[in-house]
């Protein structure tokens, strides 16, 4: 199936590009999500005319998301959970919980689909989690999972000492 992208799609392409994709990918994902339209002759002509307009709209969205990313990137999300003696959580911290807490912190609705977890969070510690609000823009937040408030303070002190020991090395190089 040939499609014309009307929004940028990560790992596929930019607005106005024509791509041949698997039928299922086009029918079940790209078309219903309004990321692409079928590449008919009429649609090709329409997209050529509307491409500039679509790119301008995308630039506006990018600038808004850049502002939101600036708010998000310095966030530290703290989760206090019950754990076993060896630090393993009874359950896990998932992308829905992270999205909910991040939405409250920045006063902007963030979907759990925008939270990219490399691995499941099943033990205490400090984790870097990717937040992707746009196909071309992403940022990271720090997620701290601990048993108690005192453990959180220990993690934060530890993180500050790591920063202070790495900064002078960067300056001297």
Swiss-Prot record:
SUPFAM superfamilies: L9 N-domain-like (SSF55658), Ribosomal protein L9 C-domain (SSF55653)
Pfam families in the cross-refs: Ribosomal_L9_C, Ribosomal_L9_N
Molecular function per GO: rRNA binding; structural constituent of ribosome
Keyword terms of this UniProt record: Ribonucleoprotein, Ribosomal protein, RNA-binding, rRNA-binding
Protein name: Large ribosomal subunit protein bL9
Function: Binds to the 23S rRNA.
Similarity comment text for this entry: Belongs to the bacterial ribosomal protein bL9 family.
Organism: Rickettsia bellii (strain RML369-C)
GO cellular component, one term: ribonucleoprotein complex
Cited InterPro entries: Ribosomal_bL9, Ribosomal_bL9/RNase_H1_N, Ribosomal_bL9_bac/chp, Ribosomal_bL9_C, Ribosomal_bL9_C_sf, Ribosomal_bL9_N, Ribosomal_bL9_N_sf
NCBIfam families hit by this protein: L9
Gene Ontology terms describing biological process: translation
PROSITE patterns, A to Z: RIBOSOMAL_L9 (PS00651)
């Amino acid at each position: 199936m040939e499609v014309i992208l009307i929004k940028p799609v990560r790992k596929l392409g930019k607005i106005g590009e024509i791509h041949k994709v698997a039928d299922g990918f086009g029918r079940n994902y790209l078309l219903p999500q309004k990321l692409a339209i079928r590449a008919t002759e009429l649609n090709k002509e329409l997209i050529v005319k509307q491409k500039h307009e679509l790119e301008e709209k995308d630039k506006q969205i990018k600038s808004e998301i850049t502002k939101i990313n600036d708010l998000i990137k310095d966030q530290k999300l703290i989760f206090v959970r019950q754990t076993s003696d060896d630090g393993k959580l009874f359950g896990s911290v998932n992308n829905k919980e992270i999205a909910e807490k991040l939405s409250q912190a920045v006063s902007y609705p963030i979907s759990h689909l925008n939270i990219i977890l490399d691995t499941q969070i099943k033990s205490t510690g400090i984790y870097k989690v990717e937040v992707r609000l746009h196909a071309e823009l992403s940022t990271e937040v720090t997620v701290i999972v601990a048993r108690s408030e005192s453990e959180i303070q220990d993690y934060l002190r530890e993180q500050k000492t790591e920063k202070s020991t790495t900064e002078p090395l960067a300056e001297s190089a």
